[in-house]
Amino acid sequence: MMNAVSRAYVRGGAQVLSTGLKASGVAVNSMANRQAHTDLQVPDFSAYRRESVKDSRRRNDTAEERKAFSYLMVGAGAVGGAYAAKGLVNTFIGSMSASAEVLAMAKIEIKLSDIPEGKSVTFKWRGKPLFIRHRTAAEIETERNVPTSTLRDPEADDQRVIKPEWLVVIGVCTHLGCVPIANAGDWGGYYCPCHGSHYDASGRIRKGPAPLNLEVPTHEFPNEGLLVVG
């Protein structure tokens, strides 16, 4: 009897197991539905491609032309960059250059052989006119013999020159700052047309409203034919 019961239990278990497997098989089949789309189109960019590169199997006949264009663009960019760099470098160097105040203190070198005897030449120095006069022997003699007692601003001629033949003065009238005219006036030196001041060939005031002689700047003669002012 026990054998019959055992066989019945086994058959029941097999039926349950078989039923479970069938149910599980139905569940698996229900989850395996395909969700993929088969009507998608592969993107085609042929309309945007140049004719020369549409066929990848064909030899590219325009490669050299396109390379030349690329080289041209790179070269143009390099030239533009060089000009931009040049501007930046010039600006940087300009910011490091001497200021106007420093330049105003600069010296000036004058070649004396360019000034003939008896002539007065004007240069620009520190923003002002500079008179360089190559005096004649007669002018030197005349100015040396002037009594200082007769002068408004007493000063002997040898106090105003380093070399007798060269007079170096700033060409600004000591009255109101006008620029005198060379080789003019009652004393043949300088004449200020603004208010009528007369200076002699030593730059000393002789007549008119100017209170002082023309200023003599610092200068030297490093050699026989060169004058350095400043």
Curated annotation (Swiss-Prot):
Binds 1 [2Fe-2S] cluster per subunit. GO terms for cellular component: mitochondrial inner membrane; mitochondrion; respiratory chain complex III. Its EC number is 7.1.1.8. Its main location: mitochondrion. It catalyses: a quinol + 2 Fe(III)-[cytochrome c](out) = a quinone + 2 Fe(II)-[cytochrome c](out) + 2 H(+)(out). It is found in: Mitochondrion inner membrane. Residues 1-35 form a transit peptide. Residues 36-67 are mitochondrial matrix. It is a single-pass membrane protein. Its cofactor is [2Fe-2S] cluster. Residues 86-230 are mitochondrial intermembrane. Residues 134-228 form the Rieske domain. Pfam families: Rieske, UCR_TM. GO terms for biological process: mitochondrial electron transport, ubiquinol to cytochrome c. It is an enzyme of class 7 (translocase). The Rieske protein is a high potential 2Fe-2S protein. Interacts with sloth1; the interaction is probably involved in the assembly and stability of the mitochondrial ubiquinol-cytochrome c reductase complex. Belongs to the Rieske iron-sulfur protein family. This is Cytochrome b-c1 complex subunit Rieske, mitochondrial. The lineage of its organism: Eukaryota, Metazoa, Ecdysozoa, Arthropoda, Hexapoda.
